[in-house]
């Protein structure tokens, strides 16, 4: 699990993005962090190994211009700084971030073949590394690249084929599915953020001047309108409107009925002895309640359970650090703990 966020509005995006990511990075990321904005037709991006604090300390990310942008915080799943998000194309006019994994689709998609075909067509992957890295796409020469780098270039290839970034992203998610959600910005469409979601969480929040996106609504400021993005769809998100187009011709289904009661009770049982639990630990203990023949929304549900418990003052979050990608760089960790009634 990673964490993502986006903002488009009247105010400068970078401070809004950092504020949202600092609220959620310990829940699912904190090991790599990157940001991208667009201003006056130019893409700006920065990324580091480490958390938001390190990105701000080691780069000029705090000064990036633009009133729209995206930000990502990644898990400890291998690779150097080029394996952090955002991923950009060679022209540096688009940036892509994602949260998720192969999951349900791991055995039915051919990520290696897609990566190799793009490489043969001349695409250059900045994350390409000699030898294998985990379960990431591999090329015929034995090297590997981040799967989101591959997706970034697949989207670019479809932009060249069908023209619009939104339709290209939609087509890429249909052809190369994973248990993911992704955000993209492109200099050809500087007035919108494009999102595609299969099953991983993405909440959308709005006020009178801006639209906010985040893995969890707990990252948002105080907003009156908050809703999840629909599954298996692509959204074009403007400052004052949202257009949603569903996927077509897919041969799988995403579970739409949440096992809320069973999962809520399991979460409360796990927290009842006073122990602190991470999001990943709570997800693992509730996975059994989802149907095996559908793609689950486990992360979305657990995030929403935690948001409900936090708003009703039944839990609090504890912040600590763990060893990061490098031994001298710590990563944030957030755990939920039950509040005891006095």
Name every feature range the model reports, one short phrase each.
Residues 1-342:
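Conserved short alpha-helical segments that host acidic/polar catalytic motifs at enzyme active sites
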């Amino acid at each position: 699990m990673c964490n993502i966020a986006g903002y488009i509005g009247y105010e400068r995006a970078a401070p809004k993005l950092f504020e949202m990511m600092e609220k959620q990075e310990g829940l699912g990321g904190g090991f790599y962090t990157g940001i991208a904005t667009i201003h006056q037709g130019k893409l700006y991006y920065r990324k580091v190994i480490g958390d938001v604090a390190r990105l701000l300390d080691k780069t000029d990310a705090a000064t990036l211009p633009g009133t729209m942008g995206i930000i990502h915080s990644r898990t400890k799943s291998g690779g150097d700084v080029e394996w952090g998000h955002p991923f950009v194309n060679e022209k540096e006019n688009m940036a892509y971030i994602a949260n998720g994994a192969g999951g349900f689709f791991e055995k039915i998609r051919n990520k290696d073949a897609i990566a190799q075909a793009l490489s043969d067509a001349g695409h250059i992957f900045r994350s390409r590394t000699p030898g294998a890295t985990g379960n990431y796409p591999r090329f015929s020469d034995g090297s590997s690249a981040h799967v989101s780098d591959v997706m970034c270039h697949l989207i670019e290839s479809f932009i060249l084929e069908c023209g619009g970034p939104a339709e290209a992203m939609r087509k890429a998610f249909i052809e190369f599915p994973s248990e993911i959600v992704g955000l993209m910005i492109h200099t050809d469409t500087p007035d919108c953020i494009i999102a595609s979601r299969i099953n991983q969480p993405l909440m959308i929040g709005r006020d009178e001047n801006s639209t906010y996106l985040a893995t969890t609504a707990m990252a948002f400021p105080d907003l009156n309108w908050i809703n999840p993005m629909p599954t298996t769809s692509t959204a074009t998100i403007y400052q004052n409107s949202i257009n949603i187009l569903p996927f077509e011709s897919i041969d799988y289904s995403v579970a739409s009925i949440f096992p809320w009661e069973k999962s809520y009770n399991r979460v409360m049982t796990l927290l009842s002895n006073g122990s602190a639990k991470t999001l990943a630990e709570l997800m693992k203990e509730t996975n059994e309640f989802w149907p095996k023949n559908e793609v689950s929304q486990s992360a979305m549900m657990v995030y929403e359970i935690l948001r409900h418990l936090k708003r009703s003052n039944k839990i609090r979050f504890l912040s600590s650090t763990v060893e990061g990608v490098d031994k001298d760089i710590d990563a944030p960790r957030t755990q939920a703990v039950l509040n005891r009634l006095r």
